[in-house]
Amino acid sequence: MALINLFDYQEAAEKRLPKMAYDYYSSGAHDEVTLRENRAAFDRRSLHYRVLRDVSARSLQAKLLGTPSQLPLFVAPMAFHRLAHERGELATAKAAGDRGLIFTLSTMATCSIEEVLNVATGPVWFQLYVYRDRALTRELVQRAAAAGCRALVLTVDAQVFGVRERDVRNRFHLPEGLEVKNLLGTENASLPKGAGSGLGAYVESLFDPALDWADVEWLASLTDLPVVVKGVVHPEDAVMAAEHGASAVVVSNHGGRQLDTAPATLDVLPSIVDAAGDRLEVMMDGGIRRGTDIVKALALGARAVGVGRPILWGLAVDGEDGVGHVLDLLHAELDKAVALCGAAGLKDLGRELVQPC
């Protein structure tokens, strides 16, 4: 069967992946309400396009934290790519870079910072958590900067771990031979095995539940790299991020994997854009599956969108080429949608374009 959209890739990936890996990638917290709502929010809005406008020359290029991008799109941080394909993050970084897109490397990667930057052909951001061991956090920041990462993405919505019941039932753990490569040489490179989710036990033992805004300032003081705060769904937190040294926020609910019944990211995006004003760049993730989804997010004020799970579906189906095809599909759909909205470029996408159904 020809794979012609991202839903096709998900269906194909489910057939290829072991159940434990597929459930880990695809699941949400508890009843998965937020997971579903992230998608449904796009379907609740229609595009009120304009006609008889010259769209013969279109530009989709963007600039994120000073870094040029061929699209207003970046690869969102996700853990454990080698569950999907033996080359893991090496393949996803290469596919994104070859298309002029930013790749965000997770702290919880199965390839190290240095390995990924060695093969990356485009800009890389580094996502991190604040560990109870601040020295370990500092070391990761220093390694990311030394390797050539362009920004730090601090995940702030996982101080404690959301309950993903599929992982609990599957007793999720990393298969033999896979480790958290950025933490090799420490006792934290392997996930525990046993009853329940090994990842849940890992997070609860290592991540600092006392994380607060002072830690954002501390992180910014460690480096000249811009700091992105990822996991914001309330406008007042965007204001706080600006006041404590962040350069950008990602409107995100962790893909519906942390607090179930949290709002869909598209629903809260406009209020956060308004609160941020010109003090922060605002990006968003959650539920992006079509070019029209990207148009809606941009029209409501996002500078760019993060794409997560579909990247892993592409990786599982056909490695680097699969990731590349997923990104190419989104590029083609976005270009077509922008034109059909009567826009010649991203600057022509305004809030009036997006209306409730």
Give the positions of each predicted feature.
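An N-cap/entry alpha-helix motif that binds or orients negatively charged groups
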Residues: 1-69, 164, 171-211, 347-349, ...
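A generic secondary-structure signal marking the coil-to-beta-strand transition
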Residues: 21, 69-73, 122, 150
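Short beta->alpha linker loops
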Residues: 29-30, 107-111, 132, 233, ...
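Short, conserved beta-strand segments within well-ordered enzyme catalytic domains
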Residues: 46, 61-63, 72-76, 102-106, ...
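Glycine-rich active-site/cofactor-binding loop and its immediate structural neighborhood
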Residues: 70-113
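Alpha/beta enzyme core
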Residues: 80, 94, 115, 119, ...
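A gly/proline- and charged-residue-enriched helix-loop-helix capping module
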Residues: 97-119, 123-137
